[in-house]
Amino acid sequence: SLYQQSYSLLVEALSSASQPRAVGETEFQQALSTAPGLYFDWQGEIPVAVLNGWLSVDSQTLTGTVRRMVLTAVEGQVLLYYWDESAAQGWVCTSDVISSSRLNEAVGSLQENGTVFAFEAEELDALATYTMVQPQTPVPVVYSATNPIAGEERRQALQEQLGFPENSISYPAAGEYVIRSRNDTLHIAEDGHVTYEAAAEGSERYRLSGTGVYEAVEGCRRLAQQTLGQNSGEATLYLISAEENGEGNWLVEFGYSLNGAQVRIGEE
């Protein structure tokens, strides 16, 4: 399948990447318009170390964060471009283990469908630069959203998913439900917000396997998947960003994606 071929090519490109060279947005956009090519939009700003961890790539050549990637070939040489949106900087590196013929083979079964990036057409300059526009106006499906923990049964399920047993001390408070277990406290608000407070003497709950960005993101991803992921309906979770906000402290943010489109909730 195209997915399996694309996955394999990306893993090989990351594993064999040469030292990257900085490029501007013009060259990056030219790469997006060059055939053959495989384009990856991660929707959020993923640290390269996290992407490598998820894809089981054992390489530290590439650094920074990546929002977009394109694997393309120029004069028989396969190139991997990526765009670091937070730094407004692009990078390119070569891969000597992938032949241009393999890239051609991966995309050979695809047919031209007229889709363009907004930057490729002057009449689309009012749109965000990397918006992809089809010739036909798509007809979106209408979805609705509800608070998945409004009922007591769902709240109890969430409590157990977060590792607070059914026999934990619990009581209602102003606009929320408070649960205590081994001096750890969980606040489940009526509007869906959940706050965890570790015991003052420290807690073994939600321990990470290491101190790096990959361990922080992966630990949070597993926790988010076993809670939010079980209550997200047809949406899936994606990583928006991961930032270190103090020594050993990380702010990891996830969002909802529905059929490839980012979902905005409330005041987002």
Question: Where on the chain are the PLM-derived regions?
Answer:
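Preferential activation on post-signal-peptide N-terminal prodomains/segments
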Residues: 1-215
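Extracytoplasmic beta-rich ectodomain segments of secreted or membrane-anchored proteins
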Residues: 209-268
